[in-house]
Structure formats: C-alpha cells, structure tokens
Amino acid sequence: MDKILLEGLNKEQIEAVTHKSGPLLIIAGAGTGKTTVITRRIAWLLSEGLAKTNEILALTFTDKAAHQMQERVDILVPYGYTDIWISTFHAFGDRLLRENALVAGLNPDFKVLTRPEAAVFFREHLFEFGLSYYRPLSDPTRFIEALIALFSRAKDEDISPGEYLSYARELKSKAEEEPENLSLKEEAIQQMEVAHAYAQYQELLAKEGLVDFGNQFYLSLQLLREHPLILKKYQEQFKYILVDEF
C-alpha cells in the first residue's frame, strides 16, 4: 500500500507525505502538487496506523478544493473519507458551532445567511445603525454590499467590533491632533461610523440567532478561546492537522 501511495512523488514530496511528527511547512507554487501531497499523506497516516479517520483534520479555503480533496482521499482510502474532517475553514467553524451550540449561545439549527440574505437583513435594520455618510439621502442602500463585505473581511481577519472601534478612536484622536488635515478628519468620521455599525450588526445577528458567513469562522474562534475545555477536546481529538494554502 505504501508503495502505491508514494508512486509518482519526488524526493521532497515523499519526505512530506511520510513526515511523522512535529510541524511541517511546504512552500510551493500553484500546480506543484500540494493537494496531492496532503491527500497522499492522509492515506499514508491511516495505512501506517498513526491516526484513525476521526483524528485527522484537513482544511482548505474553497469548497471546490475541499471537494477535490474528499474525492482524492475517497479513491486512496479503501473505506472512504466519511469520518475524516475535510472542509473549508468556514465549514469547520460551522461544525464546531453546531456541536457546541448551547455553549456558544446558539440554536443547534441556526440559520447561516448567504451574502444576499445578509444584505436584506442589513436593509431591514438600516435605520438602527446610526449611519450618515454610509446612508446618503439620494441612495440610502448604496453602501450596504460594501459594508457587509467589510464586516466579513474583518471577521475573517479575526478583528472584533471592539478592536475595530479602538482603531477608529485612535484615528479620531490623530485627526484631532492634526485639525488642518481634512482628509484624515473625514476618514476618522467614516471609520467611527463603520465601527459602530459593525458592532450593531453583530448584536442584531446574535439577538435574532443568526450567523453569517464570516461568523462561522469568527464565532468558532471565540468559542475555542473562551472555553478551554472545548478547545482541549479538539486538541486531543486531532492528532494531525493539515492545512492547504495557509
């Protein structure tokens, strides 16, 4: 079995596939076989008895890449990938939240808003965000899509509403120290507006028991940070964590 799993791999790829313990970073360009190495490694770990299927976590960024990884492992592993955790970061976060929903303050069947649904949700609460610049009278919904995208990016970067507000306040203080800098003053006003809207958006989602795409990642991080026993449970479960395109 090992010979088949290592077939067609170069020396460096074989070393990566058969690496037994400790962290390992692979730096390689597109199309160089990184996903192949990860899928072969999953199969090799199982064939060597170094891990059970539910002790391996493989993460990637896109649904397409996750499905591709699942298909390849399904071919390599006789009994399939059923119990192997192969998913995107957001899908992994979603699974953590559902498995620990009550602790996270969520209904286990919570709804995940799509981007269009998040925009509709924002529009329904438009006058609760205290917007001025980002709610122009001529076109009140003009910036909704941009704000939703910004909030999502902030959560993907693990920036909390509190941290964003701190940044906006620092910018405001700097602008007050440079009263002649009108562009800085305008930016500070805008960022303060965004910061308050971001915090309000998160509060409204929580109040209605909803989760958006960014919250799948962000809230799962919060869950692990705030609940050491839950973190420990997953640390003990996963003997090997493989990340595609970290």
Predicted features along the sequence, with ranges:
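P-loop NTPase Walker
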Residues: 1-108, 112-113, 119, 232
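Conserved helicase NTPase motor core
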Residues: 7-18, 22-26, 37, 57-58, ...
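Alpha-helix boundary/capping residues
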Residues: 20, 73, 99-100, 125-129, ...
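Short amphipathic alpha-helical interaction patches enriched in hydrophobic/aromatic residues
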Residues: 24, 46, 77, 104, ...
